[in-house]
Amino acid sequence: MTDLLIIGGGAACTRGLTTAVVEHNPKGPGQKLLITGKGRCNVTNDCDVREFLNYVRHNPRFLYSALYAFSPASAMELFESLGVPLKTERGRRVFPQSDRAADVLAALRSYAADAKFVHGSAKELLIEDGRCVGVRTSDGKTHRAAHVLVTTGGTSYPATGSDGSGYKLARQ
């Protein structure tokens, strides 16, 4: 059984777990990443967690524990270790030195090379004894895991896969 099942190919770290990713965009994960920062990918901001949280408009407390576990500095260290040299610009925004979001995506795909990718849409969460144990995909197959993480994004850009489909799953 997989340790972690990630629904949506967003930027999620595996932390050494056996991981499977269910991604419904036929072009693969990370399509929205390619257009962030006008195609340059604003990776993070070069500041501490408290300052970072000051820029979060809605419910910054929701991100508190996640950002203290994986801070902006940690993100910068990760990308540098993956061979993506970074630069800091006005407003402390951090970009790849190449100014190419594709370099960031390539590094993340390389980092996730050991993950199993399942192409298809997550249609229904599998709930047993009040706990999510997997997902049923559009082809009718079930995928089980010890933990399930929904990272489908919002509704900002449906052409990239950010169509809000994860909201329905999360309500289950």
Which residues make up each language-model segment?
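Structural motif
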Residues: 3-5, 147
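Predominantly flavin-linked oxidoreductase catalytic cores and closely associated redox partners
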Residues: 35, 102-172
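Residue-level detector of alpha-helix initiation sites
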Residues: 6, 10-11, 154-156
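Short beta-strand to alpha-helix junction loop
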Residues: 63-73, 90-110, 157-162
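Conserved Rossmann-like nucleotide-cofactor binding loop
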Residues: 11-12, 27, 123
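Glycine-rich active-site loop/strand segments that organize a redox cofactor
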Residues: 38-88
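Glycine-rich FAD pyrophosphate-binding loop
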Residues: 5-7, 17-38
